[in-house]
Regions:
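A conserved regulatory-domain signal marking ACT and ACT-like small-molecule sensing domains
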Residues: 1-176
Length: 176
């Protein structure tokens, strides 16, 4: 049985250890994960596999104890067989965006990509203060497929309209 876990809490040393220990205690294997710190909060998304001797109820009880002991917030969802067997998309490009922070950057870039049927696989954004004001940085991993040229042209137009720098970097399949 595969379970999707979303876990968050105040950033501190030992969160990954605490979560991994709770999962190990019920023989759950962490198969896929993404973890990051965001402005004092630590967030984790994990797909775990329970062995045949563990139940979803045991997992829920272990996670409730983890929440009580650590103050973390945990959500869990059982995955369907189709979700478990889904083959993830492999990105073929990285898109970087940088410039003055303002509302609408994420929407404009994602709107261009969605309009070309380009799938976003991963996104990371940061807004930071600098001597020039708030600066915005975004990196997206995407699957452009046959739309690389059209995507580059549309993003160049969006770059001018937004007043930000947008670069597209093709990934070689051998480094994926």
């Amino acid at each position: 049985m595969h379970i999707l876990l979303s876990i968050s809490g105040h950033e501190r040393a030992g969160i990954v250890r605490d979560v991994a220990e709770s999962l190990l205690n019920i023989h759950a294997n962490i198969e896929d994960s993404s973890m990051t710190a965001l402005r004092g909060r630590f967030t984790m998304m994990l797909i775990v596999n329970l062995d045949a001797n563990s139940s979803f109820g045991e997992l829920k009880a272990s996670l409730a104890e983890l929440e009580q002991r650590t103050g973390l917030t945990v959500q869990s969802q059982q995955l369907s067989e189709d979700e478990v067997n889904h083959v993830p998309l492999e990105p073929d490009c990285v898109i970087t965006v940088s410039g003055a922070d303002k509302p609408g950057i994420v929407h404009a870039v994602s709107d261009v990509l969605a309009g070309l049927d380009v799938s976003i696989v991963d996104v990371s954004t940061q807004s930071r203060e600098s001597e020039q004001g708030n600066m915005y940085m975004m990196a997206l991993e995407a699957v452009s497929g046959e739309h690389m040229d059209a995507m580059q042209q549309a993003l160049a137009k969006a770059s001018k309209e937004l007043g930000v720098d947008i670069q597209v970097h093709a990934l070689e399949s051998s480094i994926l």
